[in-house]
């Protein structure tokens, strides 16, 4: 089951960068941003659910560091499932909102910064996992070894997931900025106007 879930997640990641061949406009860029978020949260939720189930079952059937590895996977992914669920509820609210260009740019920038912050946290998870594993090996402590291996595993997945989605959002943000750059204020003797260059 875990292999099928991983295959599903990897396949989904490949489709995150699909290109919309139609002319871009404000609504399609906002919908694209929300679609990238939705994909991210579904992948996180699927990963979390698979690891929560697998970790719970395997922890009771394992010994030594493997038991602690599966326990931490279950704990960690209980949080991931909750984050994904709350994020999807928030997306329903955002789908009902109407965004103007300035608000869309602000939302896009905040999201990109958030994903960069997450990649830093992911690297910290991996580093903490390496520390725990090393300490567990040095002190022959199964709990530290298992928890460390789990943090390395989960942190690595989250790092890849967040980076893939950061670059997808960055691409969408560039298209949004290109649209903004096509807007031009004109001031003349008869008044002011906003021009959109095609």
Give the ranges of each region predicted by the language model.
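Canonical alpha-helical transmembrane segments
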Residues: 54-58, 79-94
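Amphipathic, well-ordered alpha-helical segments in soluble domains
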Residues: 48, 52-55, 126-129, 159
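Long, highly hydrophobic alpha-helical transmembrane signal-anchor segments
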Residues: 46-69
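Alpha-helical transmembrane segments of multi-pass integral membrane proteins
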Residues: 47, 79-80, 117-121
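Loop-to-helix transition at the N-terminal end of transmembrane alpha-helices
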Residues: 64-80
């Amino acid at each position: 089951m875990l292999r099928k879930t991983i295959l599903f997640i990897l396949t989904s990641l490949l489709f995150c960068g699909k290109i919309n061949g139609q002319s871009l406009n404000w609504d399609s860029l906002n919908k694209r941003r929300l679609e990238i978020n939705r994909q991210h949260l579904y992948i996180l939720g699927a990963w979390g659910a698979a690891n929560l189930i697998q970790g719970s079952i395997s922890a009771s059937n394992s010994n030594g560091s493997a038991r602690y590895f599966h326990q931490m996977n279950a704990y960690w992914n209980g949080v991931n499932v909750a984050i994904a669920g709350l994020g999807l509820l928030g997306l329903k609210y955002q789908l009902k909102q109407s965004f103007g260009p300035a608000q869309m740019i602000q939302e896009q920038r905040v999201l990109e910064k958030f994903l960069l912050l997450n990649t830093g946290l992911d690297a910290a998870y991996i580093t903490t996992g390496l520390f725990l594993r090393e300490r567990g090996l040095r002190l022959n402590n199964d709990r530290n070894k298992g928890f460390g291996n789990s943090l390395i595993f989960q942190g690595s997945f989250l790092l890849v997931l967040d980076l893939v989605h950061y670059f997808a959002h960055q691409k969408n943000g560039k298209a949004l900025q290109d649209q903004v750059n096509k807007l031009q204020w004109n001031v003349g003797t008869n008044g002011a106007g906003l021009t959109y260059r095609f």
